[in-house]
Amino acid sequence: GWPYLQHRGGPAGFMKTLDEHTLGFADYSGNRQYVSTGNFLSDDRVALFFMDYPNRRRLKLLGRVRTVGPEEADTLALLEDADYPAQVERAFVIQVEAFDWNCPQHITPRFTETELAGLPRSAVPTAAVPVVKSDSISPGV
């Protein structure tokens, strides 16, 4: 079938490092389509795309994903965000197989209001700078 792309986002830190080669994140109730979960049943390959706009960096990451359910309560607890007001439905754990830092040449810097407020005035460009209202940096999964 066609390749599939699903945006996943959350507050900074929602993607957790479990060990040197493993990442994971909690999955909460959403649009009830379960497309990613269904796709992973037939093909566990995953590509993630992380953007760091203020530092003009992007990371492509390839790996194999597995779904974690209530039978692995300890893993779910590690990936849960205690401040997020929802129940964890499942988690995704990704075994990283490869990654690549891309060239920053065509990345337009963007800042959250919090990041912009923390910069010295001399560091803020005089031209319009895109400002993201939320403090979330979101990977595509």
Please provide the spans of the model-predicted regions.
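Binding-site signature for planar aromatic cofactors or substrates
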Residues: W2-V141
